[in-house]
Amino acid sequence: MLKSNNTSETAAHKVGDKTAKKVFFRRRKGCPLSVPNAPVIDYKNPELLIKFVSEGGRMLPSRITNVCAKKQRKLNNAIKIARILALLPFVFQAK
């Protein structure tokens, strides 16, 4: 029992050590589609949907666009519907 108490003390000393590297955490920005006055996600709005599609025509992941999971699912469905209705191309042509 003394051994487990001793290890917790040494772990506490290591955490409080000034020579230890500080870990930098970047604060994640909020979802751009959840703010007030945000545009409505709709398949009939290709100008909005094109912002969430890469140059090659692939849907960008939420870790790049900072969109929350709920809005990401709505975006994916809207992009798929817009592609089927020929409002968005499946593959963008190289220039």
Swiss-Prot record:
GO CC annotation: cytosolic small ribosomal subunit
Keyword Ribosomal protein in annotation: yes
Taxonomy, superkingdom: Bacteria
Pfam families in alphabetical order: Ribosomal_S18
Biological role: Binds as a heterodimer with protein bS6 to the central domain of the 16S rRNA, where it helps stabilize the platform of the 30S subunit.
Assembly behavior: Part of the 30S ribosomal subunit. Forms a tight heterodimer with protein bS6.
Species, as recorded: Rickettsia africae (strain ESF-5)
Gene: rpsR
Record has RNA-binding as a keyword: yes
Signal sequence extent: none
Alphabetically ordered keywords of this record: Ribonucleoprotein, Ribosomal protein, RNA-binding, rRNA-binding
GO-annotated molecular function: small ribosomal subunit rRNA binding; structural constituent of ribosome
Protein name stated in the entry: Small ribosomal subunit protein bS18
Any single biological process term in GO: translation
Coiled coil stretches, renumbered: none
Record-stated family: Belongs to the bacterial ribosomal protein bS18 family.
InterPro entries in the cross-refs: Ribosomal_bS18, Ribosomal_bS18_CS, Ribosomal_bS18_sf
UniProt cross-references to PROSITE patterns, sorted A to Z: RIBOSOMAL_S18
